[in-house]
Amino acid sequence: MQLVVMVAVLALAGAGQGCSFGCHPTNISIQVESCGLTEVIYTTICEGQCYHEDLVYISHYERPEQRICNGDWSYEVKHIKGCPVGVTYPVARNCECTTCNTENTDCGRFPEDIPSCLSF
């Protein structure tokens, strides 16, 4: 259940957001479901962009360090009235640009164009 809620949080983080530079916590609302009941909860996620520079020459032996916006996460439980089963959801405690950790994050390259914040 935690994985499903985390995926929903991360998907909603990018939906309808404008450009944001720097890494910082932001408040969002998400829908959670338990016992067939749905309720909106408010949580905090990490959002923003971290500086990264692609090298002209890409070596197969030494990859450039990729930094991502991440932080310390904890989990809280929400009980929906009339349902004995609680819903666990993530809450970001702080956010910073850190080295991508392949043990808990997909650090691969994004295969498509990344939209720019610049308007020409």
Swiss-Prot record:
Cell compartments where the protein resides: Secreted
Pfam families named in the record: Cys_knot
Known glycosylation sites: 27
Disulfide bonds: 23-69, 35-83, 46-95, 50-97, 100-107
Record function comment: Involved in gametogenesis and steroidogenesis.
Keyword Glycoprotein: yes
Protein name, per record: Gonadotropin subunit beta-1
Family note: Belongs to the glycoprotein hormones subunit beta family.
GO term, biological process aspect, one: ovulation
GO cellular component: cytoplasm; extracellular space
InterPro entries xref list: Cystine-knot_cytokine, Glyco_hormone_CN, Gonadotropin_bsu, Gonadotropin_bsu_CS
Residues annotated as signal peptide: 1-18
Matching PANTHER family: GLYCOPROTEIN HORMONE BETA CHAIN (PTHR11515), LUTROPIN SUBUNIT BETA (PTHR11515:SF11)
Organism expressing this protein natively: Morone saxatilis (Striped bass)
Subunit organization: Heterodimer of an alpha and a beta chain.
